[in-house]
Amino acid sequence: MFDLDRWQEIFQTISWIEETTGTVNEWSFERFKVNHDISVDPHGYRLQHSSGANLVHSGDTGPCEELYQAIKRSNIAIVEMGVPEWVEIDGHHKPSHIESLSQRVPDTKLLLTHTYLDMKDSEFEVLTSKDYPVFNDNVIHAYDGICLKWNGQNWKA
């Protein structure tokens, strides 16, 4: 059974770190605003390990220059593509946004999450889309169980 009082008690013990930059162990981070509903306090993060490994994670967001500048300086970016092209919304990426970004940062891998697409070649029935956008080679559609490994120079999926 869900115990709301217990969760509220736990929530009060959390120390929120809201600095825009910092270091934790061997990881440095940058925190920056992204383009999404302001009520959820949307931020992206760029992480850099002392080994040279680095990545960006955006969470829910639509196109925004601050995110794209962080991606430009990174080996891989985990970005969402939450809506198909025909949806009129500003706070999520569409296929055309991803295509444009992939051309802008050809040396950065873009790992798509939170997509409206069913996984291509899935063993399950396709429910949401049978039409898959064609992207440049630096775009990867993430899937459950995907594993990213740093090989000392780049990320391998």
Regions found by a protein language model. Give the residues of each.
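Flexible loop residues that form catalytic
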Residues: 82, 115, 144
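Short, conserved loop/helix-junction motifs that constitute active-site signature segments
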Residues: 70-73, 99-107, 134-135
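Histidine-centered active-site/metal-ligand motif
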Residues: 36, 92-93, 114
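Binuclear metal-dependent hydrolase catalytic cores
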Residues: 1-56, 62-64, 108-109, 118-157
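Active-site-proximal loop/helix segments of hydrolase catalytic cores
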Residues: 40, 53-90
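Charged helix-capping and loop-helix junction motifs
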Residues: 90-100, 125-128
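Hydrophobic beta-strand segments of well-ordered beta-sheets in folded domains
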Residues: 75-77, 107-112
